[in-house]
Regions:
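Intrinsic-disorder/low-complexity, polar/charged segments enriched in Ser/Thr/Lys/Arg/Asp/Glu/Gln
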Residues: 107-109, 147
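Intrinsically disordered, low-complexity Pro/Gly/Ser/Thr-rich segments with frequent PxxP/GP/PP motifs
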Residues: 48-72, 129-164
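Short, hydrophobic/aromatic beta-strand segments
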Residues: 120-125
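Bacterial Sec-dependent N-terminal signal peptides
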Residues: 1-24
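Surface-exposed acidic loop/strand-edge motifs in secreted or periplasmic proteins
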Residues: 28-107
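Short, solvent-exposed mixed-charge patches
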Residues: 167-168
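Asparagine-centered strand-capping/turn motif at beta-strand->loop junctions
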Residues: 110-118
C-alpha cells in the first residue's frame, strides 16, 4: 500500500511539473484594431509562438508578456516567455497596445522594462497594415533599471523584437 501511495505521489508531482511549465505558445485569437469610428481591421491569428528560435519575440497589440533571458558576453540569449515575474533581475516586461480616442486610432505603443544593470539595446521590425509588410524601425535603448515607451502613428498588426544586448 505504501508503494502505491508513493507511486501516486510521484506521478502527481511529475504531471504537475509537466503541465505547470510556462507556455511559449499563444492560442489563436481574433485581432481587432480600430481605424476610425466606423472601420475596424480584423484578422484571425493562428496559434503561434511568442519566442522564436530563443532570440526573437513576436507580439501583437493587446499583449503583455514577461520575458526571461540569460546573459552571455553582453548578449541576451535563451529568451523564454514566463507567466509571471519570479526572477525580477532577469525578466523584461513588454507590452504592445493600440491607443484610441473615441473609437479612432491614435497611435500604437510599445512599453519595455529593463531589469538589468546596463542599458538594454534591441531591434524592432513592425508590420504596417498600410504596406502589408515588415519594416525596420529605430528605437531608443532602455536605461538600466528603467522603462521606455515607443510610439508610432501607424496601424501596426505585430512587432518583432530581436538582437537584445546590454551596453555601457
Amino acid at each position: 500500500m505504501k508503494k502505491f501511495f508513493t507511486l501516486v505521489f510521484i506521478s502527481f508531482c511529475l504531471i504537475n511539473h509537466i503541465f505547470a511549465q510556462d507556455s511559449n505558445e499563444r492560442e489563436s485569437f481574433d485581432l481587432v484594431l480600430a481605424v476610425d469610428e466606423e472601420q475596424y481591421f480584423s484578422a484571425k491569428i493562428d496559434k503561434s509562438q511568442y519566442v522564436i528560435m530563443d532570440k526573437i519575440l513576436q507580439i501583437f497589440p493587446g499583449e503583455k508578456v514577461y520575458i526571461e533571458a540569460d546573459v552571455l558576453n553582453y548578449n541576451l540569449i535563451n529568451l523564454k516567455k514566463v507567466d509571471s515575474v519570479t526572477n525580477p533581475e532577469k525578466t523584461m516586461i513588454i507590452e504592445f497596445k493600440q491607443v484610441c480616442e473615441e473609437k479612432t486610432h491614435k497611435y500604437m505603443m510599445l512599453y519595455i522594462e529593463n531589469p538589468y544593470t546596463k542599458k538594454l539595446h534591441y531591434s524592432v521590425n513592425i508590420c504596417l497594415l498600410k504596406y502589408g509588410k515588415w519594416i525596420s524601425t529605430d528605437v531608443y535603448d532602455v536605461e538600466a533599471g528603467k522603462s521606455n515607451y515607443e510610439m508610432w502613428p501607424d496601424l501596426i498588426s505585430s512587432i518583432l523584437l530581436d538582437s537584445f544586448s546590454l551596453i555601457d
